[in-house]
């Protein structure tokens, strides 16, 4: 069968992907996290590897000979798990504290199942549509509008991820410096100001790495991120059995040691009972409950990485890739559940939007937590340049796809992206707002709306009245409801907070 015929080869729903997926000439990997840096076009300028493919995909530049996948099943599971896990895990205890244990587990189960279903839709659409690139599926389905929707959603998600990483630097680096230098009085010290430190880290470390034309070895830092999060989970579980309940006692002790015995600490110490403080709640509804679904969707986004991982899978087939996805999603489901549960059962109603920061408020300085902070800081700092790379390339090929590489343009785009992200981190009040907004918008698009919309448009052999198409349509509508509903409630919460702040 000729290569030109492969894109029109339709596999049956029951086939494993047969000759089509095993003989695809889809040789381009979308660079997301670790997969981003394993391009098959080593001889092509990295900035010319088209992250946002144009309509001229037939050019020889993107045609290579067929290559079989070389990544083992186990390593594919690791890569996909690595693509799923991220900074969102730090906000899950906050989500549980504002939904209750039972409601959180229900929401976590539904979001994980829906995310897995969208992977199924995406894989089937890729086979039927003849592309292993997310943006190109959008272009084939809806032309320029579809391509821009996919590219815009991926870019927003990446900017959200970058912002959350820099928020971690803003929250945690001052605490690390304070602990290492044994500083108690933090008034007026610029090097303990999170905003200054974010700018300094961005200028001294992140910007030089981001200006590289080929990030190469930094691709392995995404694996470091997964290991750091596993270490973080182990520490969260251990600390549950070391921190007393109610945590008010530890909070007051910490406040007393630091010489800042605040009115809030006094109120917590004397106006709550141990029974109330240490009793888990199973269903909670308050103004912060609305952030639960966006935080969960933000935590499960991995879909731009699914197709390149599928392409690299040894003996690749759709069924085999779905098995990879099921194992990865189940592993992350357990990891997220344990992190959220033990974080919540440690602090109950005192959980902050970034769990690691909660420990410093309640426990104070701790060697084990200091090691966790250092590991997480190193991981997120080295991951930011990896995330910038596909954003910059998408912008470059959107604005000037035919121009030769220019260091000036390369530098301006990089500085602009990093500056914009720094402004978000400095002026957005909390990481919760990043999780909420990106989770309700870009993550909802990538999980719910785009895979189902592409499936409905590109899978021609199934009529609209078929069970599969009706299911995809319902999935699409549910995604629209989730996005509009979550965004609306989040905006209302922002307005309420602004009004309350103005009233004082």
Curated annotation (Swiss-Prot):
State what protein this is by name.
Sodium-coupled neutral amino acid symporter 2
Listed InterPro entries: AA_transpt_TM
Which Cys-Cys disulphide bridges does the record give? 245-278
Instruction: Please quote what the entry notes about the protein's domains.
Output: The extracellular C-terminal domain controls the voltage dependence for amino acid transports activity.
What does UniProt note about where in the body, tissue by tissue, this protein is expressed? Expressed in cerebral and cerebellar astrocytes and neurons.
Q: Which UniProt keywords apply?
A: Amino-acid transport, Cell membrane, Disulfide bond, Glycoprotein, Ion transport, Membrane, Phosphoprotein, Sodium, Sodium transport, Symport, Transmembrane, Transmembrane helix, Transport, Ubl conjugation
Give the originating organism: Mus musculus
From the record, give the transmembrane residue ranges.
Answer: 77-96, 103-123, 159-177, 189-209, 218-238, 290-310, 327-347, 369-389, 411-431, 434-454, 470-492
Positions binding Na(+) in this chain are 82, 383
